[in-house]
Amino acid sequence: MFKKLFGKGKEVQKDIAIYAPLTGEYVKIEDIPDPVFAQKMMGEGFGINPTEGEVVSPIAGRVDNVFPTKHAIGLKADNGLELLVHIGLDTVQLDGEGFEVLVSSGDEVNVGDPLVRFNLEYINNNAKSVISPIIITNTDQAASINIYDENAVIKGETKVIDVTMN
């Protein structure tokens, strides 16, 4: 009864869908050309070989971390799911060049909200790869993860993973 009175009884949804944060070609995690991601050292997920330079939020939640080098964003859902959107490979070395971050740490976001714009051609020419990993960094806290085998994905529209948190 007190929970209802004071609003602390909010039921957190354990199930969450992760949508494509980029438009492009779906890449299985094992096929990402970087062993840290391909061997799932950072967690389960997938990659996208983008065809355009805009990243949108793949989940509803909040921005947990904007990397100072602008190449990656950490997101957190209400149910505890933590997601890393990493734009390209070895892009940390670009030191923010070619990236424009549109959100700040602590911002609330919904699926499809723009997070980052980037110069696809610049990254293609100056980084190891434009293939962008999307990783569940707290995979160990998930009860189940169902990854759909897609081909082409559309940012904010194509559902790629269903996760149930513990």
UniProtKB/Swiss-Prot annotation:
Tell me, what's a Pfam family for it?
Answer: PTS_EIIA_1
Q: Name one GO biological process term.
A: phosphoenolpyruvate-dependent sugar phosphotransferase system
Q: Which cofactor does it need?
A: Zn(2+)
What's the record's note on cofactor binding?
Binds 1 zinc ion per glycerol kinase EIIA-Glc dimer. The zinc ion is important for dimerization.
Question: Can you tell me which residues bind Zn(2+)?
Answer: H71, H86
The catalytic site is made up of H86 (tele-phosphohistidine intermediate)
Where does it mainly reside?
cytoplasm
Residue ranges occupied by any PTS EIIA type-1 domain in the UniProt entry: 34-138
- Where does the record say this protein resides? Cytoplasm
Residue list for modification Phosphohistidine: H86
Per the UniProt record, the site (Important for phospho-donor activity) maps to: H71
The Gene Ontology CC terms held by the record are: cytoplasm
| Matching Gene3D superfamilies | Glucose Permease (Domain IIA)
The answer to keyword Ribosomal protein applying to this record is: no
Please provide the record's keywords in A-Z order. Answer: Cytoplasm, Kinase, Metal-binding, Phosphoprotein, Phosphotransferase system, Sugar transport, Transferase, Transport, Zinc
- An annotated Gene Ontology molecular function: kinase activity
Function description: The phosphoenolpyruvate-dependent sugar phosphotransferase system (sugar PTS), a major carbohydrate active transport system, catalyzes the phosphorylation of incoming sugar substrates concomitantly with their translocation across the cell membrane. The enzyme II complex composed of PtsG and Crr is involved in glucose transport.
- Quaternary assembly: Heterodimer with glycerol kinase (glpk).
Per the record, the domain comment is: The EIIA domain is phosphorylated by phospho-HPr on a histidyl residue. Then, it transfers the phosphoryl group to the EIIB domain.
Under which name does UniProt file this protein?
PTS system glucose-specific EIIA component
Tell me the gene name: crr
